[in-house]
């Protein structure tokens, strides 16, 4: 159990009772609690006192998720708060399509929508209507209506609670059900008959457009995006136009359009979306040409900040603990979104490669001029290219879906690996095989295709 999880168990709830105390009496309260929850489902009433608790919410959430999965109600293009999906999946999906468009010289533009306080402005009446449309009726409808009504909310600061206020809109913050209800509220956007391909992660929405030429694409977007604006307006969700931007993609600057904004007339008001040279999307910095130099510099800033801790502890902790720190503090930054940016050309990842080697030499007490090939072989760690290869093969073997360069990588691995079912056995044997061959054999197919 992590230190943060231990603190959560020690911290009491609104009633002053700690989780660790509840665990002691769990057997004694299970039966009456089960009876109470059963009666709530039968009556369609969510008791006010339980609105401050999470147990009933978790049961209700589990049943709702089971129903949504059974009838495949939520769109496949929703990635937020969904089991088995992550921000990196949304990034990979869009970047793969953009890569294909750039390779085929297809003009493409992505609009990144920013919403003003999306979670706080969800309209309860419209949310209940959305729930009814997807089959929540009778007691199920009444139960969620009861859950949302007369709901108090307060803030805890330094152990003290603020005065309770009753919320009239928005999904309850810090709750189990809140994110799920927001997904349901947003789900209808995928039913809009629009040209753009919509991807969402919570309140981060991206719409990807592609066309035959830049001029026609501008006309398509200015006509099509109005539908999306109207949908947000109909759901009482406000677009923050000052933070909503678009990014065109192409191989070179000469392949990009010359316009810098899109204009929309909504209810006699002129709205404008401006073009930007790069944008941070779900923690990954995209640029016009998907060269990733800006994103790599962004990663470098983060890992350099963390590396000072490792350098400081280098003479205090053992190699075992320093390795653990590396995997906990450095490697997550190197692997986040790597399926999108891992194919950046070596000149753009050079500084990151140098950083990784230097930090590994500190951890494993190697001299500055220690040979790179021998370093990675000795410490049995992966460089950036190997991490990209590893994650690409793992993703491709699991989903068998298109992934930039992954099919070419897949041809390299042995047949007995390909024949394994996806799981721990496959991943373990893939890592073992990856350690058995030289780094240059992995670098070659990547560098051949991108440099």
For the regions a language model picked out, list residue spans one by one.
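Short, conserved micro-motifs composed of acidic
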Residues: 161, 223, 238-277
């Amino acid at each position: 159990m992590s230190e943060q999880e231990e603190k959560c168990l020690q911290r009491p709830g609104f009633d002053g009772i700690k989780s660790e105390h509840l665990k002691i009496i769990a057997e004694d309260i299970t039966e009456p609690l089960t009876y109470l929850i059963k009666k709530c489902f039968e009556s369609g009433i969510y008791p006010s006192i339980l609105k401050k608790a999470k147990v009933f919410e978790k049961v209700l959430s589990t049943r709702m998720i089971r129903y949504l999965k059974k009838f495949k109600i939520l769109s496949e293009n929703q990635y937020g708060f969904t089991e088995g999906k992550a921000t990196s999946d949304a990034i990979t999906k869009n970047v793969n399509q953009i890569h294909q468009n750039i390779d085929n010289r297809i003009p493409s533009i992505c609009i990144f929508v920013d919403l003003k306080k999306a979670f706080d402005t969800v309209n309860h009446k419209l949310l209940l209507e959305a729930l009814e449309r997807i089959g929540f009726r009778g007691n199920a409808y009444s139960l969620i209506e009861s859950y949302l009504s007369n709901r108090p909310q307060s803030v805890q600061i330094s152990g003290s609670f603020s005065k309770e206020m009753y919320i009239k809109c928005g999904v309850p913050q810090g709750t189990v059900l809140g994110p799920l209800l927001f997904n349901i509220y947003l789900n209808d956007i995928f039913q809009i008959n629009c040209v753009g391909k919509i991807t969402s992660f919570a309140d981060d929405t991206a719409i990807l457009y592609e066309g035959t030429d830049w001029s026609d694409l501008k006309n398509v977007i200015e006509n099509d995006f109005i539908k999306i604006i109207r949908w947000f307006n109909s759901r009482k969700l406000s677009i923050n136009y000052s933070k909503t931007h678009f990014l065109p993609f192409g191989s070179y600057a000469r392949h990009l359009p010359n316009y810098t904004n899109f204009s929309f007339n909504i209810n006699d008001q002129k709205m404008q979306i401006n073009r930007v040279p790069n944008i941070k999307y779900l923690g990954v910095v995209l640029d016009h040409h998907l060269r990733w130099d800006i994103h790599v510099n962004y990663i470098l800033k983060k890992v350099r900040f963390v590396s000072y801790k490792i350098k400081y502890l280098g003479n205090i902790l053992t190699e075992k603990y320093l390795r653990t720190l590396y995997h906990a503090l450095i490697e997550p930054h190197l692997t986040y979104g790597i399926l999108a940016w891992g194919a950046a050309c070596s000149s753009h990842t050079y500084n990151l490669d140098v950083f990784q080697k230097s930090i590994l030499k500190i951890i494993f007490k190697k001299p500055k001029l220690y040979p790179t090939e021998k370093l990675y072989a000795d410490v049995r760690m992966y460089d950036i290219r190997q991490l990209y290869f590893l994650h690409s093969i793992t993703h491709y073997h699991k989903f068998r879906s298109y992934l930039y360069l992954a099919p070419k990588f897949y041809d390299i691995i042995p047949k007995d690996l390909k024949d394994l079912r996806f799981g721990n056995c496959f991943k373990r044997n893939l890592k073992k095989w990856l350690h058995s061959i030289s780094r240059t054999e992995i670098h070659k197919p990547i560098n051949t295709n991108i440099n």
